[in-house]
Curated annotation (Swiss-Prot):
Catalytic function, reaction form: (2R)-2-phosphoglycerate = (2R)-3-phosphoglycerate
Assembly information from the UniProt record: Homodimer.
Entry GO MF terms: phosphoglycerate mutase activity
Residues the UniProt record annotates as site (Transition state stabilizer): H183
Enzyme Commission number(s) of this protein: 5.4.2.11
Organism, scientific name: Xylella fastidiosa (strain Temecula1 / ATCC 700964)
Pathway field: Carbohydrate degradation; glycolysis; pyruvate from D-glyceraldehyde 3-phosphate: step 3/5
GO biological process: one example: glycolytic process
Name the UniProt record assigns to this protein: 2,3-bisphosphoglycerate-dependent phosphoglycerate mutase
Species lineage: Bacteria, Pseudomonadati, Pseudomonadota, Gammaproteobacteria, Lysobacterales
Gene coding for it: gpmA
Presence of keyword Cell membrane: no
Amino acid sequence: MTRKLVLLRHGQSQWNSMNRFTGWVDIGLTEQGHQEATMAGHLMKKEGLEFDVAHTSLLKRAIHTLQDALKALDQDWLPIYKSWRLNERHYGALQGLDKIDTAAKHGEEQVNIWRRSYDIQPPPIDLDDPSHPMRDRRYAALDRKVLPVRESLKNTLERVLPYWNDAIAPQLNDNKTVLISAHGNSLRALYKYLNKESDEKILNVNIPTGIPLLFELSDTLQVVSYRYLGDPDAAQRAAEMVANQGKAK
């Protein structure tokens, strides 16, 4: 009997629509983002998915996406677990910058490396920056040493993996059907781990907003199959749009 896991990237955020690096900045959804989240719920309902538990980050774009999707699923009552470990990758000093302007300044190749490589970090955020996570009370209980000033995808995976091992994997092993509403890079990290994707191939993996990615896992949590729900061509086009965000005009 296979276990079912759905990875759902949040719907379009306000900074997605403005093509800005977002990272740990707590930006809300656009109206389109809410619609994407609701449509994701309808797609999961059409698939006949009945979840036992849901997980999300501490950032409202992922939280609100989960709320909208569960409402469309008529599964609002599900227990929801929130963890900072599911937050987006911290983009350091790039946070808030326009991706096209940054590509024009530093070159498309450099921006693509910052965005999509596995182990290269962006420039760090300054410790005195008002947006440093140590100034955000949602992280007040955490040791400052674990709060990032920048992250590569490798760093993000190292952050996400303990939560997977301690919270999510045990639920899957208990035959629970699990929904994770999170972010492009925290989900890319899980995608890499689940699919045993190479450091090179992960460069070309782009996860679109608001389209559920359904994994079927064996009893040892090995991937049996995975696919986007809905129109596969639409999912491919949406992923290509994500890939093109870092290109200069």
